[in-house]
Design a protein with these regions (language model features):
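Non-membrane alpha-helical secondary structure
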Residues: 1, 5-8, 69, 110, ...
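Short helix/loop capping segments that flank catalytic or ligand/cofactor-binding pockets
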Residues: 102-104
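Short, low-complexity, charged/polar segments at coil/turn and helix-coil boundaries
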Residues: 6-7, 11-100
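Protruding loop/beta-arch "assembly-hinge" segments enriched in small, turn-prone residues
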Residues: 107-130
């Protein structure tokens, strides 16, 4: 499993004084939405298999999930939203355990690309609080 971590989030959170949890949620939702929507879709299985868990990676796979691109994205995002809402102060793991996800990541860099854009997401979240 490849692990990407967001760096320097604490420096940005200091700017919002008391609104840290809102910034963390907004950034996590935006980045999660980015890589879910960047995941290639043939039958929706890979895009529909994103999961969010607190403090440990998810281990489940929904092999039979099939849906349109937008249905698959909504399916994954709805599963991730609850954990993201409770993530402040905890480790948040967004995982996809479908066996070919690393191959898709090597082709498209959907997670890596979203993580590289995290500064933009943090800036937007901080601006949204003012």
């Amino acid at each position: 499993m490849t692990i990407y971590q967001l760096r320097n989030l604490d420096k940005w959170v200091q700017k919002v004084k008391g609104e840290e949890d809102k910034v963390v949620r907004a950034v996590a939702l935006q980045i999660t939405n980015e890589f879910i929507n960047r995941t290639r879709v043939r039958y929706g299985t890979a895009r529909g298999n994103w999961h969010a868990e607190l403090n440990a990676p998810a281990v489940n796979i929904e092999r039979d999930y099939v849906g349109t691109p937008s249905e698959a994205a909504q399916h994954s995002l709805s599963k991730c939203t609850k954990a993201i809402a409770e993530a402040y102060g905890k480790r948040l793991f967004i995982t996809n355990n479908i066996e070919y996800i690393e191959h898709l990541e090597s082709l498209d860099s959907m997670v890596r690309g979203a993580v590289l854009e995290f500064n933009r997401a943090i800036d937007a979240a901080v601006k949204g609080l003012k």
